């Protein structure tokens, strides 16, 4: 399909990425409609996918996506947890509509539902796990693009992109390459290297992320709390001036009023006793 155009040919860098992500590894069984994409069969029974055919179908899918006038009418779907991050990233860069997680039955056929949508094109991660939107798309004549393994059913699938759909890295890499080709056809990026790395499309287990964060915190050096520095004023050269300035600066507390206070310590400061009350027994004689 790419012909002799060097721009559309498969680059060595892309082949290296595919091999590192195990995109070429199929399954032990093969669908009769996927036999045309199988390169050979290993001795252990695993089928090897032809990466040249994979890239050709990827370019064909990118041309179909770029032909849609409004990018929001392209729906990217993944009910498998390993492909949800890739779907969200793809929708972010291409302005598509993502459906990550469980697909609501009847979203394409039941107009009474609040989640009713009318997309012009569907892209699914795996037609085996995303069979519900693929089946509903066949009822309303919506074309479907799907990433298919050697054993994936291709019924109601218009464009099948052969790849390894059981590997988290393979799924993320294929979504990344599809987004890159779509942006190139739209003229958003050049045919040079795209600054977005494929790692952003890979699935990350939350538990593994927490373990990595804990390991980083454990390896970081422990910084003890350092007390604040005490600011000490410079000693004055003249003690008289310092005492005067300190006395003027510090407010003096008001003296407590003490009843009957005397300057002479020898005098008795005891207050005289109050006169006794009249006796209840009668008047004194």
From Swiss-Prot:
PANTHER family according to UniProt: 40S RIBOSOMAL PROTEIN SA
Matching Pfam families: 40S_SA_C, Ribosomal_S2
Matches recorded under CDD domains: RPS2
Protein family (similarity comment): Belongs to the universal ribosomal protein uS2 family.
Role played: Required for the assembly and/or stability of the 40S ribosomal subunit. Required for the processing of the 20S rRNA-precursor to mature 18S rRNA in a late step of the maturation of 40S ribosomal subunits.
Gene3D superfamilies noted in UniProt: Glucose-6-phosphate isomerase like protein, domain 1
Gene Ontology CC entries for this record: cytosolic small ribosomal subunit
Organism annotation: Anopheles gambiae (African malaria mosquito)
Alphabetical GO biological process terms: cytoplasmic translation; ribosomal small subunit assembly
Name listed for the protein in its UniProt record: Small ribosomal subunit protein uS2
Superkingdom per UniProt: Eukaryota
Localization: Cytoplasm
Main location: cytoplasm
Subunit structure: Component of the small ribosomal subunit. Mature ribosomes consist of a small (40S) and a large (60S) subunit. The 40S subunit contains about 33 different proteins and 1 molecule of RNA (18S). The 60S subunit contains about 49 different proteins and 3 molecules of RNA (28S, 5.8S and 5S). Interacts with ribosomal protein S21.
UniProt entry keywords in alphabetical sequence: Cytoplasm, Ribonucleoprotein, Ribosomal protein
Low complexity: compositionally biased ranges: 271-285
Source organism phylogeny: Eukaryota, Metazoa, Ecdysozoa, Arthropoda, Hexapoda
Annotated TM spans: none
Stretch list, region Disordered: 262-285
Signal peptide: none
Gene Ontology molecular function: structural constituent of ribosome
PROSITE patterns: RIBOSOMAL_S2_1 (PS00962), RIBOSOMAL_S2_2 (PS00963)
């Amino acid at each position: 399909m790419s012909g002799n155009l060097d721009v559309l040919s498969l680059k060595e860098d892309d082949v290296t990425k595919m091999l590192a992500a195990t995109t070429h590894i199929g399954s032990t069984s093969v669908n009769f409609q996927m036999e045309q994409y199988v390169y050979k069969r290993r001795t252990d029974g695993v089928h090897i996918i032809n990466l040249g055919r994979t890239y050709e179908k990827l370019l064909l899918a990118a041309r179909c996506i770029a032909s849609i006038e409004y990018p929001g009418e392209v729906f990217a779907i993944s009910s498998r947890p390993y492909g949800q991050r890739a779907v969200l990233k793809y929708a972010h860069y291409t302005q598509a509509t993502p459906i990550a997680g469980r697909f609501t039955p009847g979203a394409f056929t039941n107009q009474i539902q609040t989640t009713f949508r009318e997309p012009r094109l569907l892209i699914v991660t795996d037609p085996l796990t995303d069979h519900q939107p693929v089946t509903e798309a066949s009822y309303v004549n919506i074309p479907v693009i799907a990433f298919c393994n050697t054993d994936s059913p291709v019924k109601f699938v218009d464009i099948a992109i052969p790849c390894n759909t059981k590997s988290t890295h393979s799924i993320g890499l294929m979504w990344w390459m599809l987004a890159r080709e779509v942006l190139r056809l739209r003229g958003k990026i050049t045919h040079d290297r795209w600054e977005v790395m494929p790692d952003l499309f890979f699935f990350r287990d939350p538990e593994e992320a927490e373990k990595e964060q804990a390991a980083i915190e454990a390896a970081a050096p422990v910084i003890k709390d350092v007390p604040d520095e005490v600011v000490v004023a410079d000693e004055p050269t003249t003690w008289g001036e310092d005492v005067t300035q300190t006395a003027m600066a510090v407010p003096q507390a008001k003296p407590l009023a003490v009843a009957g206070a005397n300057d002479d310590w020898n005098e008795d400061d005891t207050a005289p006793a109050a006169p006794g009350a009249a006796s209840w027994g009668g008047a004194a004689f």
